[in-house]
Amino acid sequence: MSSKIVREPATKAVADGTYHIKNGGYYLAVNPDRQIIIQQTVYAWTVFVDGEYNYFKDPKTTHYLTDNGGQNVLSPKADVDGRWGNASVDIPTQLINAETERSLGVPYGTPSDTWILVQV
């Protein structure tokens, strides 16, 4: 008789809260012109969970991270391109936009394929 080893999933989904979205020593941020950038200074996002998806709100504006025509920008939450999947608090993962199925890419700063969310 053999027994199976049951393992927990490799990643933990995030809960509502405030997080840094980071890769190594770089943080996903928003500059004063509302452009999505990467910087070495910490930057906090407000994260909302909607089923299996997340919304990432910029706390300095009323807008959310969206994938609009392949360019990551800030837009109102009502934008269908504002939902993201794959967010994890323990293993760096690609953040995939639920509507466009594209991974997060940042036009200003050091590009990165994977991200981890660190609760503040």
UniProtKB/Swiss-Prot annotation:
<comment type="function">
    <text>May play a role in the structure of the hypha-forming fruit bodies.</text>
</comment>
<protein>
    <recommendedName>
        <fullName>11.9 kDa wall protein</fullName>
    </recommendedName>
</protein>
<keyword id="KW-0134">Cell wall</keyword>
<keyword id="KW-0964">Secreted</keyword>
<feature type="propeptide">
    <location>
        <begin position="1"/>
        <end position="12"/>
    </location>
</feature>
<dbReference type="GO" id="GO:0005576">
    <property type="term" value="C:extracellular region"/>
</dbReference>
